[in-house]
């Protein structure tokens, strides 16, 4: 079995003691970490087939992106002035409902490339409609780890006909997807049931998905308390807000992740804490869309598990988890008038070990420890904006680093990116195909691309 040694870097372990090891090394066998320690000790003990020189670099556990939509990546930059519901109804949903299998593959592959180049080694992604298989194939080919599922809805007052499903048929199809994809790619992919939202799904559909999740012991991924109008519509229909409604249908729990959680009530926060239901915090997209700012520092104080997320490039416009850390810290501190609302250390935890906890994966990823999966990133510290380092490394990683500073990425023990060169997908080919496909998609689906300023061909 191949052994890999990453040596000579500063290892930010994110273990329980939060050890940072200068001139550290990580030994890997197969897809697991064998040992972590000082380079001289690890190199003496382990003679590995492949050695990676991490001199001048930080070695971190890969980022865990707790909420993403890969198949929306080709929507980047559209609908900038729309509120969420307008963007959904006029752009995102028509786009998702009209994609061909090839377009879904390329869009998801493009997102995977961006995630990996930004240091994300695991994502929790919700892929739409009948093309979910193609998105899962792209995830497999990219080499990223993923909690992945098919986004489904059935209420005609919530989503267009192209995205509406028959509940009974949808449950059968999801069971097929579970059998095909849960544990696929040598265990890198785990399936989750993904009701799009409480508002957009009938009780019949939600109950059926809850039964599937219990039967196969898999996770749940949805949006909750994201937008005021759907929340009020759900209250009128059921008498319950999102989290309470999900809880009444047994869709909460340690393996349940709810994106956004902007309007979570005190009672819902208590439910999330007691059931260990997690919140996926994507700070930039809701603020950018004028949707609101989740009270994440309060949720954390309430004992709710929270992980960091980028959401979709189709709304956020990028998948840079470094930026999400910075925005999260800035807006939580700014809105609470408290510079300690989210500490710098906590922000790095949200992107790594806390993200793993939010997805119930902290027994295998999220920190660099012996026995865990070998998911690591190398960040080049030899940059003006990261100098001087000293003992300010954690501060620099959160407030100064960019996605472009990620030099190499290891996922499941495999070197997926080396010195910014992706070793799985053909990056230039995917970028070319994405550009060619994008214009045709918009024309076919009647989605208007309005430039901000006069555009002269």
For each predicted feature, which ranges?
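His/Asp/Glu-enriched, well-ordered alpha-helical/loop segment
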Residues: 248-255, 297-387, 400-401
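Alpha-helical scaffold segments that flank or form the walls of functional sites
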Residues: 76-144, 170-186, 435-443
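Metal-coordinating catalytic core of metallo-dependent amide/deamination hydrolases
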Residues: 134-269
């Amino acid at each position: 079995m191949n052994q890999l040694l990453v040596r000579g870097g500063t290892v930010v372990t994110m273990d329980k003691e939060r050890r940072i090891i200068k001139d550290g090394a990580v030994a890997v066998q197969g897809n697991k970490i064998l040992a972590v320690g000082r380079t001289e000790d690890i190199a003496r003990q382990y003679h590995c087939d492949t050695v990676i020189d991490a001199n001048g670099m930080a070695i971190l556990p890969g980022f865990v992106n707790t909420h993403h939509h890969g198949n929306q990546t080709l929507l980047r930059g559209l609908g900038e002035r729309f509120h969420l519901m307008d963007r959904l109804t006029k752009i995102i949903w028509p786009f998702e409902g009209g994609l061909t299998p090839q377009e879904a593959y390329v869009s998801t592959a493009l997102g995977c490339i961006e995630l990996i180049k930004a240091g994300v080694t695991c994502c929790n992604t919700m892929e739409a409609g009948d093309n979910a298989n193609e998105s899962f194939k792209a995830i497999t080919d990219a080499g990223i780890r993923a909690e992945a599922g098919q986004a489904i809805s059935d209420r005609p007052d919530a989503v267009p006909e192209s995205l509406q499903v028959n509940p009974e048929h949808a449950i059968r199809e999801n069971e097929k997807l579970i059998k095909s994809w849960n544990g696929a790619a040598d265990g890198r992919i785990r399936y989750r049931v993904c009701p799009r939202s409480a508002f957009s799904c009938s009780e019949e559909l939600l109950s059926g998905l809850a039964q599937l999740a219990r039967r196969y012991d898999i996770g749940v991924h949805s949006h909750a308390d994201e937008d005021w109008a759907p929340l009020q519509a759900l209250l009128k229909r059921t008498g319950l807000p999102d989290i309470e409604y999900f809880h009444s249908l047994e869709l909460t729990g340690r393996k349940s992740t709810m994106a956004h959680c902007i309007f979570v009530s005190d009672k819902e926060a208590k439910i999330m804490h007691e059931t260990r239901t997690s919140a996926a915090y994507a700070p930039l997209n809701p603020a950018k869309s004028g949707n609101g700012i989740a009270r994440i520092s309060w949720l954390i104080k309430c004992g709710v598990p929270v992980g960091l997320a980028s959401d979709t490039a189709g709304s956020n416009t990028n998948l840079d988890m470094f930026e999400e850390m910075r925005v999260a810290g800035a807006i939580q501190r700014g809105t609470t008038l408290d510079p300690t609302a989210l500490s710098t250390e906590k922000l790095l935890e949200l992107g790594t070990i806390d993200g793993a906890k939010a997805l119930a994966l902290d027994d295998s990823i999220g920190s660099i420890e012996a026995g865990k999966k070998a998911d690591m990133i190398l960040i080049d510290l030899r940059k003006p904006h990261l100098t001087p380092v000293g003992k300010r490394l954690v501060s620099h990683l959160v407030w100064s680093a960019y996605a472009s500073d990620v030099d190499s990425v290891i996922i499941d023990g495999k070197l997926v990116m080396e010195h910014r060169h992706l070793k799985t997908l053909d990056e230039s080919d995917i970028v070319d195909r994405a550009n060619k496909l994008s214009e045709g998609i918009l024309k076919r689906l009647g989605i208007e691309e309005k430039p901000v300023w006069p555009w002269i061909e």
